[in-house]
Amino acid sequence: MRSVSGQVVCVTGAGGFIASWLVKILLEKGYTVRGTVRNPDDPKNGHLRELEGAKERLTLCKADLLDYQSLREAINGCDGVFHTASPVTDDPEQMVEPAVIGTKNVINAAAEANVRRVVFTSSIGAVYMDPNRDPETVVDETCWSDPDFCKNTKNWYCYGKMVAEQAAWEEAKEKGVDLVVINPVLVQGPLLQTTVNASVLHILKYLTGSAKTYANSVQAYVDVKDVALAHILLYETPEASGRYLCAESVLHRGDVVEILSKFFPEYPIPTKCSDVTKPRVKPYKFSNQKLKDLGLEFTPVKQCLYETVKSLQEKGHLPIPTQKDEPIIRIQP
């Protein structure tokens, strides 16, 4: 492996929530980065150009996942590829085919460029969606979502991520590409980009009053900085292989709103569950041991949620209360 300072890596979908942090940390570590975006001149990618080291070592390449030639040009000459780009939608036509074809195109372009490794950003959606799994089963890298269940419930995002990951494994095996996959859960944390992405919107709606109640359901969370660091760890660790579940905690939505209301009592955070007739859903068990074994230390979920809200305030997506002192944070693990 060449020294980091000599390495050129490609990050697809560089303007995204996870990818922006990935680009930031790669630049800080001394990598030269090629980031693919649909339009390098779009103001929404301006935050990337402002990153430390961007002027010297970041190139934004115009590319589309469905345009093989554009990907080929971006990846040619790279040592590694981080494939984070993906549609985020429950429209089957916009999700499934672009995710699968785009992933195959990236793997093929990586094979042609003879890159050292591809790190593919999959999702918990490719792992968790299985109604027949025993509640006591520990969710880990051996688990896969049930495709029929995803289709029948019209959960096209999870279905698309699952079939895209399967396509990545098949294509990588056929083309001889060293592929490692990361499966993050719902990603929270500070925003680098100017827009609010879908995962952070999940928290924002609890603070703006648009959500009057919280669901009787559970959600797994992880900090965006940890996800970015995990990508780099999987790229830099020669013995890394297979899939890696990236999760810090599983919380009931009631626990989430309780944490938020303690930190930010000035916001109209819901206090009632939308479903009081059924028993409270219990958090599922999961294992993040594979990433811990590589040395990743996870940010506690309370700290992550606090930093998410502070970022939403700083970016102007959430009004900042004026008549309140800053809370003293005592974050318990």
From Swiss-Prot:
Residue sites binding NADP(+) per the record: 13-19, 38, 44, 64-65, 84-86, 157, 161, 184-187, 199
Entry PTM: The formation of a reversible disulfide bond reduces activity by perturbing the positioning of nearby catalytic residues.
Reported pH dependence: Optimum pH is 6.
Principal location class: cytoplasm
Superkingdom to which the source organism belongs: Eukaryota
Catalysis performed (reactions): (E)-coniferaldehyde + NADP(+) + CoA = (E)-feruloyl-CoA + NADPH + H(+); (E)-4-coumaraldehyde + NADP(+) + CoA = (E)-4-coumaroyl-CoA + NADPH + H(+); (E)-sinapaldehyde + NADP(+) + CoA = (E)-sinapoyl-CoA + NADPH + H(+); (E)-cinnamaldehyde + NADP(+) + CoA = (E)-cinnamoyl-CoA + NADPH + H(+)
Keywords: Cytoplasm, Disulfide bond, Lignin biosynthesis, NADP, Nucleotide-binding, Oxidoreductase, Phenylpropanoid metabolism
Pathway involvement of the protein, from the record: Aromatic compound metabolism; phenylpropanoid biosynthesis
Known outcome of mutating residue 150 to A/S: Increased activity
Gene Ontology terms: cellular component: cytoplasm
Stimuli inducing this protein: Circadian-regulation with peak levels occurring in flowers during the light period, in the afternoon.
GO molecular function, one term: oxidoreductase activity, acting on the CH-OH group of donors, NAD or NADP as acceptor
Active site (catalytic residues): 161
Subcellular location per the Swiss-Prot or TrEMBL entry: Cytoplasm
Activation/inhibition comment: Inhibited by sodium iodide-mediated oxidation.
Pfam families per the UniProt record, alphabetical: Epimerase
Gene3D superfamilies in alphabetical order: NAD(P)-binding Rossmann-like Domain (3.40.50.720)
Biological processes per GO annotation: circadian rhythm; green leaf volatile biosynthetic process; lignin biosynthetic process; phenylpropanoid biosynthetic process
Tissue: Expressed in flowers, leaves and stems.
Family classification: Belongs to the NAD(P)-dependent epimerase/dehydratase family. Dihydroflavonol-4-reductase subfamily.
Task performed by this protein: Involved in the latter stages of lignin biosynthesis. Catalyzes one of the last steps of monolignol biosynthesis, the conversion of cinnamoyl-CoAs into their corresponding cinnamaldehydes. Mediates the conversion of feruloyl CoA to coniferylaldehyde. Also active toward p-coumaroyl-CoA and sinapoyl-CoA. Involved in the production of floral volatile phenylpropanoids in flowers of fragrant cultivars (e.g. cv. Mitchell and cv. V26) from cinnamic acid, a common precursor with the anthocyanin biosynthesis pathway involved in flower pigmentation.
Full protein name: Cinnamoyl-CoA reductase 1
Species per Swiss-Prot/TrEMBL record: Petunia hybrida (Petunia)
Gene: CCR1
